[in-house]
Amino acid sequence: MAAQSGAAHVLDLSAAPCLRVAYSLLGKHNMTSPHLFNLEILKYPRTPHLRGSRLQVGDQADAVPYEALAGRHIVVEEKLDGANAALSFGADGSLLLQSRGHYLQADQMGGRERQFNAYKQWARAHEGALMALLDERYVMYGEWLYAKHSLYYDALPHWFCEFDIWDRVAQQFLDTPQRHALLSGVPVVSVPVLYAGISPRRMQDLLALLAPSLGRSARWKAVFEDQVQRQKLDLPLAWRQTDRSELAEGLYIKVEENGQTVERYKFVRSDFVQVILESGSHHSERPIVANGLRTGVDIFANAIQKSW
């Protein structure tokens, strides 16, 4: 049975303080328990756009001016095009997997959660190491990139790319150096960092970081076409649902102070948004086209290459 989206109590970390989650209701591996849908879930904060992002009608009403970053320490990451996911553990050691506002059925494959099959298998394979690291203290958020959305990747270092960690004890998001240090001993890849330092004086200097995606090879278009044809899918339709640009989706910008991430913003290419608007369907309604991993990547290995 697919997880019941919206049935769990959602704690939006951007809108309210985090409360201690009553995870003890779940038994070990009992991911089909009805209690699963009654647990409070720590939903990743909504991220505002920087002014100039998207550039669709009405988009600038809630956008933040670049001046808000003036003189502040920022970390700029490539914004990846995947599914927001998270991994944590309950007080009794229960493995908890989530996708945005709902929990996943960790031991059930297929159905509406089919794009997360490999995520569930990967989490189970590394459950011991992740439990020893995260325990019930940390919630690890990441981008799950198995299924193509609008960008196709053919050279990813992993399908799960971590981008934030919430500390339930300190009630804050760790900054980038702490996250990387915490994850140094486990086979978890983090999203690529493009810049860290005081924000550039001009927005155009920030936007100069928007370059070809690090998750693609020079042959990604040919690889994509080969895969679509192997799956016997409609190639012209597949291209209409795919961004042809060589560039990444956009930039993700974090403001980090005193060991924590205190603000976050995003900048998304307007032509990327246009592809979504003109595709005629949502990615969840299409056949899955799996993004490719870099040659030699084994997501189940105990040691992996973390670089991009």
Predicted segments with their positions:
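Core nucleotide-handling region used for phosphoryl-transfer chemistry
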Residues: N30-W308
